[in-house]
Structure formats: C-alpha cells, structure tokens
C-alpha cells in the first residue's frame, strides 16, 4: 500500500487529522488495533473547549454535537461548604465549553471518514514503524491481528496511538526526553441512571477528598471521587460511593445530589507526561502519544485537536507549496501550548485534591488559593481563560 500520510491510531487525534487532510486533498490511511465497536463503545467523558467545537463545525462534523451537546457558560468551585460560580462566558467575552462525550466525537469522525471514502483498518496487530528518518517511512501491521504482514509506504507517519503505542518508542532514546509526574491519588468514576444534579460542572474540595459532578445526558449523570492510587474498585460498594459523594458535596444551602442505579464504575490513574521532541525525521506524534494530563483540567482531547491542527497545517504547506517550515517547528509550536495546559491541569489537580502528605500549612495554602481564584476577578479571568482553552499561536 502507498499513501501520503500513514496514521497510527483511530482515536480523536488520528481521526481529526485524517479528516483535516482529506479536506485539503491529502491522502491518508489509518490503522487501529481495536475494533470499530471497541473504540465507539468505550465510554469516556468529554469537555470540549470553544476551539475544539469551532474546529469540528468548520470540518463539517459538528451537527450532532451541536444538537446533543450540553453548553456550559460556567462551572462551580465548592469548598468549605459553599459553592462559588466561575462565569466563563462573561470572563472570556462570550465563550463556553461543551460537554459531549469523547466516544460520541469518535462516532461522528469515523462516520465522516467512511462516508468520504477514508481508509481505516480496524483490529490490526503487530504494528511497527520503519525508516522514519528517511523520505519513505513505512508502517507494518497484520490485518485482523494475525493475518499476513502488510506494509504501508508513506511520505509521513502520524503517531496518534496513545501513551502505550509503538510510535513514541520509534523516536530514539538518545533524542527523546520525557517529563513525568505521577499523582498519589486516582479518580473513581461512575455513570448513573439519574438526571443531572446540577446544570454545570461542580468541582468540590473537601477534607475527605475531591469530588466532581458532571453530566452525560438528560437521563445520565457522571460523578467522580478521589481515591487512593492503590485502591481497587472492589473496595467500593454502591452504598459506600453514595455515602462519600454526599459527604464531599454537602453545602450549607441544601444541595441535593440525585441518586440512581450505577451502571458503570472504574478507577482512573492520574499522571502528567510530556515527550520532547514530538517529531523525528518523518514521524510526528500527536495526542496521548506525546503528552498526558490529569483529567481535572479536561484538556486531553482538546490538546489532541490542537496538535493535529498544527500538523495538518504543516502538511498542507508541504504538499501545496513545498514548504517545511511549520513541519520543522511542530514540536516548538505544540509544546508551547502543551506546557501551559500541563501547568493548568497540574494547578487544578493540586488545588482541588487532598494529598495525605500535606501539612496543615499546605492545607491552609490550598484553601487560600481557592478563596483567591473565586474572589479576585483577575484570578477568575485567568482561570476561565485556561479552562476555555488558550489560543493557537504559530
């Protein structure tokens, strides 16, 4: 097989990139180690920045998102038994965030690629990258996990295959520098058959730990609890989960948490990670292959969307004008924004979670930070600007 851009991974990064390239007349082939049913059926939350929503609409894949998504003009920070609303819409000149699950984004993008003749090979195995530092890099894989080995010859490879995929290790260790922080806590997330308990997201800092109230649909709400990093889901009965949520979300004004049957629950680890550089030869990384953020800042999918916008623009300049300038600067352009998103995600995580190693002094600093960002317009504006998504800067 021969194509212009070989894309490894059919997550948000790979699918967005493929469709952006299609709109510019650039060919691509996507390979993915999971089945279509797996990637479309893995339920994951999604809080989309204004820029990501705008991108999907500009690409012509945003119709269902605009119909079914929940548009939030703010969010609440809750501590010391009181809620404090951050009016993002007002503080950012009319912008908002959209709650639309990641797997729904994937469904829309897969449908768009297939409807326009895009090639996606699902359920592949033994993926490997070759000759990435030449002008003709190659991807090898086995169809249906154990079929006969096939090869895609490309001009460029986009590694959109997540944190554990084969793309990042294809950058030599002598070239690659990795930055990482692993947090001493995790999130226990549940999906509940109950209407949302609030119209906007609630981020709660409590003596017992962090809690988050989110939404999935008018009939389903998503809730999270901070738990120990070594904890196991078997330790958490439904009754224990509800008891802890009620305790951490309690307010002096009688907030009511709506209960219902829990039909999904699991524990998600928390880490921050950055790979530098995000490119080597004709290989470019995007999304979780290049960086991970804790979910507190809701930046994962949005960073992937930003990465592929830069890469798509660089590839467009190469194929239409023979220019390599943007491609050569991809790492520089992307990492400038990524590090700011990493900072914001770390800031939100450390401000909202209880670390068992904290002294009373550090607890006092944490509460002072919360008080400051909710009482100072300047601090609230900074928070809102980061939450809504920083601009792309080339």
Swiss-Prot record:
**Enzyme Commission numbers on file:** 1.14.13.33
In this chain, FAD is annotated as bound at 32, 42-47, 102, 288, 301-302
Example of a GO biological process term: benzoate catabolic process
Annotated site (Important for catalytic activity), which positions? 203, 387
Keyword annotations from UniProtKB, A to Z? Aromatic hydrocarbons catabolism, FAD, Flavoprotein, Monooxygenase, NAD, NADP, Oxidoreductase
GO MF terms held by the record: 4-hydroxybenzoate 3-monooxygenase (NADH) activity; 4-hydroxybenzoate 3-monooxygenase (NADPH) activity; 4-hydroxybenzoate 3-monooxygenase [NAD(P)H] activity; 4-hydroxybenzoate 3-monooxygenase activity; FAD binding; flavin adenine dinucleotide binding
Q: SUPFAM superfamilies in the record, alphabetically?
A: FAD-linked reductases, C-terminal domain, FAD/NAD(P)-binding domain
Q: How is the cofactor bound?
A: Binds 1 FAD per subunit.
Give the enzyme's main class according to its UniProt record, as a single word. oxidoreductase
Task: Please list the reactions this protein catalyses.
Answer: 4-hydroxybenzoate + NADH + O2 + H(+) = 3,4-dihydroxybenzoate + NAD(+) + H2O; 4-hydroxybenzoate + NADPH + O2 + H(+) = 3,4-dihydroxybenzoate + NADP(+) + H2O
Gene3D superfamilies per record: D-Amino Acid Oxidase, subunit A, domain 2 (3.30.9.10), FAD/NAD(P)-binding domain (3.50.50.60)
Which cofactor(s) are needed, names only? FAD
Which residues are listed for substrate binding in this entry? 203, 214-216, 224, 295
Chain's role? Involved in the degradation of 4-hydroxybenzoate (4HB) via the protocatechuate (PCA) 2,3-cleavage pathway. Catalyzes the conversion of 4HB into 2-hydroxypenta-2,4-dienoate (HPD). It is highly specific for 4-hydroxybenzoate, and is able to utilize both NADH and NADPH as electron donors at approximately equal rates.
Family that this chain belongs to: Belongs to the aromatic-ring hydroxylase family.
What's the protein name?
4-hydroxybenzoate 3-monooxygenase (NAD(P)H)
Q: What is the originating organism of this protein?
A: Paenibacillus sp
Originating gene: praI
């Amino acid at each position: 097989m021969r194509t212009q851009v070989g894309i490894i991974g059919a997550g948000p990064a790979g699918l967005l990139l493929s469709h952006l390239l299609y709109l510019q007349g650039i060919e691509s082939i996507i390979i993915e180690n999971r089945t279509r049913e797996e990637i479309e059926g893995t339920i994951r939350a999604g809080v989309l920045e204004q820029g990501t929503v705008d991108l999907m609409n500009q690409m012509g894949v945003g119709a269902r998102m605009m119909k079914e998504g929940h548009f939030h003009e703010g969010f609440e920070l809750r501590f010391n038994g009181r809620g404090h609303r951050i009016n993002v819409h007002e503080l950012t000149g009319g912008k908002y965030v959209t709650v639309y699950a990641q797997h729904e984004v994937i469904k829309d993008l897969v449908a768009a690629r297939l409807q326009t003749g895009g090639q996606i090979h699902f359920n592949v195995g033994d993926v490997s990258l070759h000759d990435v530092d030449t002008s003709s890099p190659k991807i090898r894989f086995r169809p249906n996990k154990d079929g006969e080995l096939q090869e895609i010859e490309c001009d460029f490879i986009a590694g959109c295959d997540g944190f554990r995929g084969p793309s990042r290790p294809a950058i030599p260790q002598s070239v690659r520098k990795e930055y990482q922080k692993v947090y001493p806590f995790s999130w226990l997330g549940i999906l509940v058959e109950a209407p949302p308990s609030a119209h906007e997201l609630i981020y709660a800092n409590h003596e017992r730990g962090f809690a988050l109230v989110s939404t999935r649909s008018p009939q389903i709400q998503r809730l999270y609890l901070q738990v120990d990093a070594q904890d196991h889901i078997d330790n958490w009965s439904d009754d224990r989960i509800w008891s802890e949520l009620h305790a951490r979300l309690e307010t002096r004004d009688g907030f009511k948490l709506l209960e219902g049957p829990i039909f999904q629950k699991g524990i998600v680890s928390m880490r921050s990670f950055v790979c530098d550089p995000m490119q080597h030869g004709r290989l470019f990384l995007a999304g979780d292959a290049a960086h991970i953020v804790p979910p507190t800042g809701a930046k994962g999918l949005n960073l992937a969307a930003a990465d592929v916008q830069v890469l798509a623009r660089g590839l467009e300049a190469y194929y239409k004008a023979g220019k390599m300038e943007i491609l050569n600067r991809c790492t520089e352009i992307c990492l400038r924004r990524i590090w700011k998103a990493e900072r914001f995600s770390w800031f939100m995580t450390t401000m909202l979670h209880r670390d068992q190693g904290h002294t009373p002094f550090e607890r006092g600093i944490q509460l002072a930070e919360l008080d400051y960002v909710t009482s100072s317009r300047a601090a609230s504006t900074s928070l809102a600007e980061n939450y809504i998504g920083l601009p792309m800067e080339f």
